[in-house]
Amino acid sequence: MTTADLLAAGHKVTVYDSLISGHAVAVPPGAELVVADVRDQEVLGHVLADHSIEAVVYYGGFIVAGESMAQPGRYFANNVGGAICLLNTMLEYDVRRFVFSSSAAVYGEPESVPLSEEAPIRPVNPYGQSKAIVEAMLRWYGSQSDLRYVSLRYFNAAGATDKLGEDHRPETHLIPIVLQVALGQRPSVPLYGSDYPTPDGACIRDYIHVSDLASAHILALRRLEEGSGVYNLGNGRGFSNREVIETARRITRRRILVKEEERRPGDPPVLVASAEKAKAELGWQPQVTSLEGIIESAWRWHRAHPEGYG
């Protein structure tokens, strides 16, 4: 979505993706796609040199917290190693503007919510730790060079547009899983943990629509002219996994069965954002602020694309 927004604003965009989890068909017309690993410094250098790149928006990295608990080495090699290669190559080719897709996972288990950017950084899984390491790296790179960066700490990205939606193989995100059950593509929704210290015993998360995340990246690119910064991106309201499932039942009018499972290691009980800093400094204002709106958009996409991107 960020790519489409940049193209609409008249920018030239090169998408660099290994396609390990991405989909070539999701790249909009007008953008060039280079299929390669970000750790391939030779290919990366050619792209930066040949395309006169002015800024990099880095969405790369593995993102499944539970998987990171089982495969920490894989996550650090890809998420941290990839960022090191990218930043070093950027500086070699005089590219000095960087927007980083970070995560609320850097906070771990917060003492209170909503979380501001000043909350302690105490990740509880290798995924969150990998994001925290890259943020620390950026502070050092920024202090020792003229690199300017913005780190955007996403809370739970969700929802879809008519053209773009979630299609992970395997799917691990709650809302797509719930909608797959509604479509009859899987028997039930696994509910990981029913004994958390929350009103209904389930994890609570702050959901933010993907189109609002995309707009934040555009604003972050503009912010780079003024300097570096770190911003939370969320709606400021938390919903439990049970509330998400019940909302999906109302929207889809389908039977959605739940199977309670043990807690997953590395899942904090509650993560809710304060995004006041992003609103004040970036001029960011989320447009899809209700859980119903987020799930309705995802439901439209999943019904129209029951096999995902194919």
Regions found by a protein language model. Give the residues of each.
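A short acidic, helix-capping loop that chelates divalent metal ions and anchors anionic groups
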Residues: 65-69, 160-165, 199-201
